[in-house]
Amino acid sequence: MSNVTVIGTQWGDEGKGKIVDWLASRADIVVRFQGGHNAGHTLVVGDQIYKLSLLPSGLVRGKIGVIGNGVVVDPKALMTEIDRVTAQGLVVTPETLWIAENAPLILPVHGALDRAREAARGDHKIGTTGRGIGPAYEDKVARRAIRICDLAEPETLDWKLDELLLHHNTLLAGLGAETFTKEQLKDFLAEITPRLLPFSCQVWDRLDEARRAGRRILFEGAQAVMLDVDHGTYPFVTSSNTVAAVAASGSGVSPSSVGFVLGIAKAYTTRVGEGPFPTELHDQTGRTLGERGHEFGTVTGRPRRCGWFDAVLIRRAVRVGGVSGIALTKLDVLDGLDEISICVGYELDGQKIETFPSAPGAQTRVKPVYETMPGWKETTAGARSWAELPAQAIKYVRRIEELIEAPVTLLSTSPERDDTILMRDPFED
């Protein structure tokens, strides 16, 4: 029996929500280990539609949900989300939701700085959601973050707020934005502290006990490898590491506890916001993929850019992300296309290359080298076994496996939870 870690392998929005929900029904504990409330997904359970950004997906299946120390927590957003799902019938208590006491908080000053800096960038925006994720991670690394455990120590909180405001107010004033007083932040924290503190605990200790007891743990990643602050399309990335190794450091478990790493990838590629996108399609095919795939951001509502499957990027994600197998989603969106292209390499300044460059200028200059395959006219929507798939769709999946150097262990053929073909059980690996 193994634990399972789920990560995205593209630029997010790969359909992690459905896959995590599908796996969560077989797990005992579901853990968020990085990111904040800047990414979200939609889960459908019976006649209820849940939109989650911070809460672990397992809560909708009656499992224990964990927010690890690697997550930056906006307490206001968290309480709003808890109130919303509670009104829908979910039970969210300190027994069902554990939050790491050493998780850093996102305060109103972080969002204000995030938005002020993005506005000041003019034509060089990086596409931040303006929710304070980046500034909160900056504070963590600079050792001035307010952590949940600080709320229980008024004296500690007092001097840490002084240090935090000295930094942030200097930046805000320099950007011509409104500054904050200590009283404003104290009032904000005083309001949420009674609700937040009961959920806080030593998550690392509880997870270690669960592991020793043989309980199945599902680690739920946010964003994706190509948005990783080190390995993604920097600076058009998120502010945290998103690879599977962070499941350990972001929740306080040993590296060996990460288990089977399931990378999620769409059968094509999408991206929200700014940044390089070698296989982006600006034609009718791109628009068709967006319309069929309902490609709009869960959190931002922004339309996603669409393009062909990029095997070069996924192969990189497999290697740096530690991916054991791929869950390929939205295969049905490709139904009916005459031809389907896969990016198998790039051209950069007239030379062929087999890996994606790190320099921003080179990333924007690469041109995709495509391999084209015939499409299929039959439908794959709702298929639940290989026997139900068109022969050409199977060839497409097999070619992807060859190019990314990893097996497709799970195939999703519609947004419905049970429209899933399982080739290999990650929990039994």
Swiss-Prot record:
Amino-acid positions noted as binding substrate in the UniProt annotation, renumbered to this chain: T298, V299, T300, G301, R302, P303, R304
Top EC class of this enzyme: ligase
Protein name: Adenylosuccinate synthetase
InterPro entries in the record: Adenylosuccin_syn_GTP-bd (IPR018220), Adenylosuccin_syn_Lys_AS (IPR033128), Adenylosuccinate_synth_dom1 (IPR042109), Adenylosuccinate_synth_dom2 (IPR042110), Adenylosuccinate_synth_dom3 (IPR042111), Adenylosuccinate_synthetase (IPR001114), P-loop_NTPase (IPR027417)
Cofactor: Mg(2+)
Chain residues that bind Mg(2+): D13, G40
NCBIfam families the record matches: PRK01117.1, purA
Reaction it catalyzes: IMP + L-aspartate + GTP = N(6)-(1,2-dicarboxyethyl)-AMP + GDP + phosphate + 2 H(+)
Recorded superkingdom: Bacteria
Predominant place of localization: cytoplasm
Function: Plays an important role in the de novo pathway of purine nucleotide biosynthesis. Catalyzes the first committed step in the biosynthesis of AMP from IMP.
PROSITE patterns: ADENYLOSUCCIN_SYN_1, ADENYLOSUCCIN_SYN_2
Binding site for IMP: D13, E14, G15, K16, N38, A39, G40, H41, T129, R143, Q223, T238, R302
Enzyme Commission number(s) of this protein: 6.3.4.4
Pathway connected to this protein: Purine metabolism; AMP biosynthesis via de novo pathway; AMP from IMP: step 1/2
Cofactor info, note text: Binds 1 Mg(2+) ion per subunit.
Keyword annotations from UniProtKB, A to Z: Cytoplasm, GTP-binding, Ligase, Magnesium, Metal-binding, Nucleotide-binding, Purine biosynthesis
Positions of the catalytic residues: D13, H41
Pfam family, one: Adenylsucc_synt
Complexes and interactors: Homodimer.
GO cellular component: cytoplasm
Amino-acid positions noted as binding GTP in the UniProt annotation, renumbered to this chain: 12-18, 40-42, 304, 330-332, 412-414
Biological process per Gene Ontology, one example term: IMP metabolic process
CDD domains given in the database record: AdSS
